[in-house]
């Protein structure tokens, strides 16, 4: 009964209730992807690995699932590894985030901390949608130079004179 209840809840969430008795070859590509996601969510596992689970879903369903998946994960006593290239997905899921570069973790921490205080340019770029505006600046006293433009800027930032790269999110 517990399994039937979980299947029903996940099937409803993923809009699969009408397809529960269909064979795999009778399902569209999107329905097959949702079915694979449903199988992962129904199982009582200690670890769930999800690789781009929302990638090929239509916009409306993807937006609904961005809201609902975190709620499903909260009810589970398991570890969820959610691989995504979508910053919004990572922010919605929350928890901890690892930024990877060529298979190596270059930043790890609470998702909002990684977003708000990226430790490197790669983490900053990965977590920006739309893309972050990147500029090289130099600081001398209270003068900041961006390209050939001098800007006098009083700041509470305690940074040394020198060259920097700044990122501005739109």
Language model feature labels by segment:
Residues 1-120:
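ABC ATPase nucleotide-binding domains
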Residues 24, 58, 130, 148-150, ...:
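Short, well-ordered turn and helix-capping elements at secondary-structure junctions
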Residues 99, 144-145:
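Short aromatic-centered micro-motifs
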Residues 103, 140-143:
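Beta-strand-connecting loop/turn residues
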Residues 107, 141, 152-154:
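A sequence-level detector of short linear motifs
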Residues 116-140, 167:
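C-terminal boundary and immediately downstream tail of ABC-type ATPase nucleotide-binding domains
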Residues 147-170:
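Glycine/charge-rich catalytic "coupling/switch" loops of P-loop NTPases
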């Amino acid at each position: 009964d517990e399994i039937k209840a979980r299947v029903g809840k996940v099937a409803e969430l993923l809009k699969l209730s009408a397809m529960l008795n269909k064979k795999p070859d009778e399902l569209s590509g999107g329905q097959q992807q949702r079915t694979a996601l449903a199988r992962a969510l129904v199982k009582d596992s200690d670890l769930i690995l999800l690789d781009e689970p929302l990638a090929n879903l239509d916009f409306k369903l993807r937006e609904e699932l961005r809201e609902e998946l975190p709620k499903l994960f909260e009810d589970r006593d398991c570890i969820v590894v959610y691989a995504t290239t979508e910053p919004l997905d990572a922010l919605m899921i929350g928890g901890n985030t690892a930024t990877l570069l060529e298979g190596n973790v270059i930043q790890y921490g609470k998702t909002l901390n990684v977003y708000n205080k990226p430790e490197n340019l790669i983490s900053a770029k990965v977590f920006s949608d739309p893309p972050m505006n990147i500029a090289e600046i130099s600081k001398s006293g209270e003068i900041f130079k961006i390209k050939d433009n001098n800007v006098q800027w009083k700041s509470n930032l305690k940074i040394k004179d020198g060259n920097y790269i700044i990122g501005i999110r739109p």
